[in-house]
C-alpha cells in the first residue's frame, strides 16, 4: 500500500469529539471511547506508527492552543510513520499507474 502526503500539507490528530448537546451518561463516554479505539486500531494497522506514539500525538496538550492534539506537516507525518512518503499529485498518479500495472501483470 502506498500512502503519500504533500510536503506543504498538514494533518490534525485529536481525540474524538462532538459539537452540540450530548447526554452526559457513562454510556455516552463509553461510546466515544469505543469509537476512538476503532480509529486508533485502523490507523496503527494501516501505517507504521505505533499505538503509543499515535495516542501521545492525539493527547498532546503542548501543540495546540487551548486544545488537545497535534498538527503534523508533511515531513513530520512521514518521519513518525503515519504516512509512507512525501509526494504531490504527479507522484500519486505515478504510484497509482504502477499499482495498476502490477495488478495487470499478476492477473496475466
Where in this protein do the model-derived segments appear?
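N-terminal organellar transit peptides
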Residues: 1-108
Amino acid at each position: 500500500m502506498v500512502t503519500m502526503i504533500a510536503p506543504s500539507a498538514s494533518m490534525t490528530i485529536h481525540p474524538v469529539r462532538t459539537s452540540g448537546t450530548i447526554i452526559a451518561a457513562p454510556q455516552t463516554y463509553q461510546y466515544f471511547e469505543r469509537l476512538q479505539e476503532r480509529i486508533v486500531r485502523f490507523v496503527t494497522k494501516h501505517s507504521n506508527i505505533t499505538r503509543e506514539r499515535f495516542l501521545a500525538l492525539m493527547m498532546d496538550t503542548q501543540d495546540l492552543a487551548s486544545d488537545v492534539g497535534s498538527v503534523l506537516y508533511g515531513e513530520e507525518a512521514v518521519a513518525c510513520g503515519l504516512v509512507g512518503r512525501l509526494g504531490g499529485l504527479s507522484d500519486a498518479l505515478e504510484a497509482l499507474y504502477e499499482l495498476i500495472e502490477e495488478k495487470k501483470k499478476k492477473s496475466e
